[in-house]
Structure formats: C-alpha cells, structure tokens
Amino acid sequence: MSFCVLIPARLASTRLPRKVLLDVGGIPMIEQVRRRALESGAAQVVVAADHPEVVDCIRSYGGEALLTAAEHVCGTERLAEAARLLGLADDAIIVNLQGDEPGMTPALLHATAQLLLDHPQRQMATAAVPITHWDELADPHAVKLVLDAEGCARYFSRAPIPWDRSHFPLSSGQTLPQTPGIWWRHLGLYAYRNAFLQDYAAWSASPLEVIESLEQMRALERGVQIAVYCAAEAPAAGVDTAADLDRVRDLFP
C-alpha cells in the first residue's frame, strides 16, 4: 500500500497575493511544491486549486490538478473535497502538503505517511522537530506539542509546554535544559486515512481549537490519536510574506 499527496492551493491569498503562481527557481511556486511531492515516493500527486488559473498552470507542466470550490474556509475542507472528486478509497493514505512550501523535504513527506502505513490503527499523523532555545519555546507563533509514551500527541499549544518549573522562565537567547525528547515544535504537515479525513473536515470547531487557533485540536478533543514523526531538523519554512519569498528563492538559484 502506498500514499498520495494532495496539495491545496489558493490563488486568493491575502498577505502575498497570488503567491502560488509567483516565480521560484524559474517556475511557479506551486509547481516547485508539486515536484517535491513527486520525489517523496507518492503513488499520486494532485493539486487541489480554488481557481482555474492554478489548474491550468499545473496541467501545463504535465501535472494533475482539480478545481475545487472557492468558498472552503480551510485547506482541510479543500483536501476532503479533492479526495471525493478523485474517488479515493476509504483506507487511502493522504498527505496534506501546503501549496506555499517549496522547501519541504520529500523524505519528511514519506516518513509522515509511513507512520500510517506502519500503524493501521492510527487515523492521523503529523511531524515535529526539537526545540533547543527559549526564544522559540516562548514564541506563540511556534506551535508546541507534548508526546506520550506511544509517540502520539497529547496536546498542542502556543504556550511554552511543558513548563520546567525548576528552570523557567529563561532569558532571551538561552538554551533549554539538556533533556532530550521533551520540547517539540509542530510542523504543519499531516497525513490522514481518507475515511477519517471526511469525518474530520465535517466536524465543527472545538472549544480548544478556538482558544488556541489550532485546527488539529478538534481531533484531540474527540479522542483521536495523532501519531508524530520526530524529525532531526525542520524543512525551510513556508511562504507568507515577500520576505519569505526572497528567502525561499535563495534555495532555488
């Protein structure tokens, strides 16, 4: 059994308009993302777009793309619609790769999907990297997670968790206590089984999801075990601003 990668892509981005079609290394960003997915070993890679212009772009490079509804409020809803349009089986493993992450490493995509291939009882998987400095742990834009003994997420938060009562808070620039496997930053990469994805996308927002502004909390609050692949280092961050775009372009001279 293999996996597929679906790439939700919005042309109507707010902070950086039309970013998925902006040039990165001589081709549109969304095509760079698709090429990273193709290198992951996925059996199928499909871009799920909100506009015909994105669909036409991908098809001009010989790729597979679908036009999905424009009114989806999140990428998960777009992903679920694309899976239905493709007629994917209930047990199909789907990796959700954002259309603004041309620096994603194919190995990380494969490893996250492999968690579901190796653990048939799991319905959802994600990834994380170690946090070593206080500034990152204290940053509310860096989402933290706590793992249980089975390698599944117990909680996600923008707060610095777990809180080391003996040492915290630290000063800016300080490294965290040398306790391996304690502090983790969540990476916004997910894999799902299709039947679960369809249910998950239809669930209403949960209380903790609203408080933390973290969509994955709706799964935890319903008792879903989210398997976590612990990577050694993070891929290049996604593109939200013009400064991000300049940084990513340096990776593709």
From Swiss-Prot:
SUPFAM superfamilies: Nucleotide-diphospho-sugar transferases (SSF53448). The keyword Metal-binding does not apply. It is found in: Cytoplasm. HAMAP family: KdsB. NCBIfam families: kdsB, PRK05450.1-5. One of its GO terms (molecular function) is 3-deoxy-manno-octulosonate cytidylyltransferase activity. It comes from the Bacteria. Pathway: Nucleotide-sugar biosynthesis; CMP-3-deoxy-D-manno-octulosonate biosynthesis; CMP-3-deoxy-D-manno-octulosonate from 3-deoxy-D-manno-octulosonate and CTP: step 1/1; Bacterial outer membrane biogenesis; lipopolysaccharide biosynthesis. Keywords: Cytoplasm, Lipopolysaccharide biosynthesis, Nucleotidyltransferase, Transferase. Activates KDO (a required 8-carbon sugar) for incorporation into bacterial lipopolysaccharide in Gram-negative bacteria. This is 3-deoxy-manno-octulosonate cytidylyltransferase. It is an enzyme of class 2 (transferase). Belongs to the KdsB family. It comes from Acidithiobacillus ferrooxidans (strain ATCC 23270 / DSM 14882 / CIP 104768 / NCIMB 8455) (Ferrobacillus ferrooxidans (strain ATCC 23270)). GO terms for cellular component: cytosol. Its EC number is 2.7.7.38. It holds the Pfam family CTP_transf_3. Its main location: cytoplasm. It catalyses: 3-deoxy-alpha-D-manno-oct-2-ulosonate + CTP = CMP-3-deoxy-beta-D-manno-octulosonate + diphosphate. InterPro entries: Cytidylyl_trans, KdsB, Nucleotide-diphossugar_trans. GO terms for biological process: CMP-keto-3-deoxy-D-manno-octulosonic acid biosynthetic process; lipopolysaccharide biosynthetic process. The keyword Transferase applies.
